[in-house]
């Protein structure tokens, strides 16, 4: 039985003299929640456009459920939620949803769509052009789910949502994943990717430079930090001269020492008789991991 929902094999995409995507390969299994991340211009949008069949690779091939992306059977299995929401003026939300449901052989029921997306009775009877930003996001999510897709592709899905709406949204996404649906999303909220994604694919300069769970990616970088509070008059000069201390940051009322050897820094704090209180050892953040990966990739080019 085929386990992969998406297979990308040796794919390159050229635009005139620019290479937007350079020889990437990966596969995403059914039921997986994967985040595609990277700085602006990294190739993320091009990759997603090729997965959707909107662009064709210059080299290599992409298969969705072992078929080409523009196959009609494949299109019926995909739901897409874009960052920019286009509405159909003159129609009410329930009319738009019924129209979209009619395009698919096995659509979700209206009751299921309302339950999954938190659309209210008032939302359903509102004309599209009168929707608020939050209502438009809920409609966009409902349209992506209308055909009961096996693969959901979400572009910055929680932009404009408040904290409770985001929490509910990701609860729904995990429930869909538990049903075997595959979810691919992009986001600039790295904490969201850390919390929601089972797997992260990080792109920079058109290359796939990291692929793994959030924990696996964080573990690829060595930087950690030791933080503590300190008496305001105490100097850290004698601590700063040691090579294990890479950087000293004063943030709010805490002192943060970046290092690749936390054990040595802890020993130095006591050895130098630093009167530190509330000492904490912290792992690298996903943001720090991505900055190091992006910088390392530029240096290698």
Curated annotation (Swiss-Prot):
So which domain of life are we looking at?
Bacteria
- Residues annotated as binding ATP are 38-45
Which part of the chain is the ABC transporter domain?
Answer: 6-230
PROSITE patterns named in the record: ABC_TRANSPORTER_1, ABC_TRANSPORTER_2
Q: What are the alphabetically sorted keywords of the record?
A: ATP-binding, Nucleotide-binding, Translocase, Transport
Pfam families, A to Z = ABC_tran
Give any GO molecular function from the UniProt entry.
ATP hydrolysis activity
Q: What is its EC number?
A: 7.-.-.-
PANTHER family in the record = ABC TRANSPORTER ATP-BINDING PROTEIN (PTHR42711:SF17)
Tell me its family: Belongs to the ABC transporter superfamily.
UniProt-recorded name of the protein: Uncharacterized ABC transporter ATP-binding protein YvfR
Protein's organism: Bacillus subtilis (strain 168)
């Amino acid at each position: 039985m085929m386990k992969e929902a998406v297979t990308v094999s040796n794919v390159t995409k050229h635009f005139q003299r620019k290479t937007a995507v350079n020889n990437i390969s990966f596969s995403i299994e059914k039921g997986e929640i994967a985040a595609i991340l990277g700085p602006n211009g990294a190739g993320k949008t091009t990759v997603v456009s090729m997965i959707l069949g909107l662009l064709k690779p210059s080299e290599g091939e992409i298969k969705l459920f072992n078929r080409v992306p523009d196959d009609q059977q494949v299109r019926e299995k995909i739901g897409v939620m874009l960052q920019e929401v286009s509405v159909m003026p003159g129609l009410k939300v329930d009319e738009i949803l019924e129209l979209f449901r009619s395009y698919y052989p096995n659509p979700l029921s209206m009751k299921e769509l309302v339950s999954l997306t938190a659309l209210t009775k008032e939302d359903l009877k509102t004309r599209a052009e009168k929707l608020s930003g939050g209502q438009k996001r809920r409609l966009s999510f409902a349209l992506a789910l209308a055909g009961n897709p096996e693969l959901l592709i979400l572009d910055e899905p929680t932009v404009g949502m408040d904290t409770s709406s985001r929490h509910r949204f990701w609860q729904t996404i995990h429930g869909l994943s538990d049903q075997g649906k595959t979810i691919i999303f992009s986001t600039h909220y790295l904490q969201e990717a850390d919390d929601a994604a089972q797997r992260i694919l990080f792109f920079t300069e058109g290359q796939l430079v990291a692929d793994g769970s959030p924990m696996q990616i964080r573990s690829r970088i060595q930087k950690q930090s030791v933080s503590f509070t300190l008496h305001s008059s105490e100097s850290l000069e004698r601590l700063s001269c040691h090579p294990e201390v890479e950087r000293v940051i004063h943030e709010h009322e805490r002192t943060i020492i970046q290092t690749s050897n936390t054990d040595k820094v802890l020993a130095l704090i006591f050895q130098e008789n630093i009167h530190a209180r509330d000492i904490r050892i912290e792992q690298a953040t996903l943001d720090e991991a991505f900055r190091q990966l992006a910088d390392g990739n530029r240096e290698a080019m």
